[in-house]
């Protein structure tokens, strides 16, 4: 007897309902034309890591907890004297999520993390890049339930980029709205 593979809740929702909604709305002739989520990139810039490498390692550990996947420390490519930055110094960390981890992260972001943001009024609907990708910034990474602020001691901001296969911003906005992204009216 074969075991059934785990499928994230949002992936099931996409396969059952969202794909048909988008096909009806935009009139796609082929199933492969329907936009879908491609990847989610989490980026955390840690300016204090220039002086203390442990800050970058702590940020990478926190980002790994949030993403459920090991974070990669990013290094500077050029020296900038005004920031006292030399080449190949740690300046942040990043994670790229795909497949099941991507759907799980988006589910946690929408249902758990964003409602914990202070004075949250909704996501900016103008943060699309013109090619169907959406970016948002978070000021404190402690809104995620995986992070214990008492152990971390610091809070860093992070950038979240949701990459889709949509060709236009309208298609991407319809896709993300179907996934219950809370856009401002």
Curated annotation (Swiss-Prot):
This is Large ribosomal subunit protein uL5. It comes from Rhodopseudomonas palustris (strain ATCC BAA-98 / CGA009). The keyword Ribonucleoprotein applies. This is one of the proteins that bind and probably mediate the attachment of the 5S RNA into the large ribosomal subunit, where it forms part of the central protuberance. In the 70S ribosome it contacts protein S13 of the 30S subunit (bridge B1b), connecting the 2 subunits; this bridge is implicated in subunit movement. Contacts the P site tRNA; the 5S rRNA and some of its associated proteins might help stabilize positioning of ribosome-bound tRNAs. Belongs to the universal ribosomal protein uL5 family. The keyword Endoplasmic reticulum does not apply. It holds the Pfam family Ribosomal_L5_C. Part of the 50S ribosomal subunit; part of the 5S rRNA subcomplex. Contacts the 5S rRNA and the P site tRNA. Forms a bridge to the 30S subunit in the 70S ribosome. PANTHER family: 60S RIBOSOMAL PROTEIN L11-RELATED. HAMAP family: Ribosomal_uL5_B. InterPro entries: Ribosomal_uL5, Ribosomal_uL5_bac-type, Ribosomal_uL5_C, Ribosomal_uL5_CS, Ribosomal_uL5_dom_sf, Ribosomal_uL5_N. GO terms for molecular function: rRNA binding; structural constituent of ribosome; tRNA binding. SUPFAM superfamilies: RL5-like (SSF55282). Keywords: Ribonucleoprotein, Ribosomal protein, RNA-binding, rRNA-binding, tRNA-binding. Signal peptide: none annotated. The lineage of its organism: Bacteria, Pseudomonadati, Pseudomonadota, Alphaproteobacteria, Hyphomicrobiales.
């Amino acid at each position: 007897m074969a075991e059934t593979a785990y499928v994230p809740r949002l992936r099931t929702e996409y396969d059952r309902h969202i794909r048909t909604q988008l096909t009806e709305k935009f009139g796609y002739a082929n199933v492969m034309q329907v936009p879908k989520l491609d990847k989610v990139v989490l980026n955390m810039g840690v300016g204090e890591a220039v002086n203390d490498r442990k800050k970058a390692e702590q940020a990478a550990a926190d980002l790994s907890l949030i993403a459920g996947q090991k974070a990669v420390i990013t290094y500077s490519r050029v020296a900038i004297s005004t920031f006292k930055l030399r080449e190949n110094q740690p300046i942040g960390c990043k994670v790229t999520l795909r497949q099941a981890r991507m759907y799980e992260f988006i589910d946690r972001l929408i249902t758990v993390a964003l409602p914990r943001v202070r004075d949250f009024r909704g996501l900016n609907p103008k943060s699309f890049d013109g090619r169907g990708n959406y970016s948002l910034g978070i000021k404190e990474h402690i809104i995620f339930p995986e992070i214990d602020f008492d152990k971390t001691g610091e809070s860093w901001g992070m950038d979240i980029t949701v990459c889709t296969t949509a060709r236009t911003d309208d298609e991407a906005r319809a896709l993300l709205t179907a996934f219950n992204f809370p856009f401002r009216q």
